[in-house]
């Protein structure tokens, strides 16, 4: 028997260089974004969700880490990897983000900045789940 991994879903766990040095700046950046737009937008969330963000000094550090990973990793043959947008979410106890996908995105990522004890988990489900149900 031959097994062909036709539609694999890879999840990469990548460390951001100097993350400890920028964590406080990230939290300040997020707080400033929320103060500037306290209502935010509603997508898949019950908490606060920012507008799409394109750039900023703190986001540049995150972008650099991602670009370095994808352009230097032999697993992918990606030329000129580019981060095209970011969103910020801030959830209070009881807030959620429902299961969702990112149409048109070749890759998506999460940077978990602060999680109080007894918080919920980040869960991933197969993007091919529609193939698992009989119609």
Task: Please provide the spans of the model-predicted regions.
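Catalytic core of non-heme Fe(II) oxygenases with the double-stranded beta-helix
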Residues: 85-135
């Amino acid at each position: 028997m031959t097994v062909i991994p036709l539609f694999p879903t890879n999840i990469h766990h990548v460390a951001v260089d100097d993350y400890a040095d920028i964590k406080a700046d990230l939290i300040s950046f997020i707080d400033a974004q929320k103060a500037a737009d306290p209502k935010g937008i509603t997508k898949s969330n019950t908490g606060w969700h920012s507008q799409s963000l394109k750039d900023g000094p703190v986001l540049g550090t995150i972008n650099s880490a991602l670009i370095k990973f994808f352009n230097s990793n032999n697993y992918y043959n990606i030329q000129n990897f580019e981060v095209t947008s970011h969103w910020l979410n801030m959830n209070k106890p009881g807030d959620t983000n429902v299961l969702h996908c990112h149409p048109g995105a070749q890759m998506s990522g999460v940077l978990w900045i602060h999680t109080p004890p007894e918080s919920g988990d980040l869960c991933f489900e197969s993007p091919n789940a529609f193939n698992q149900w009989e119609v």
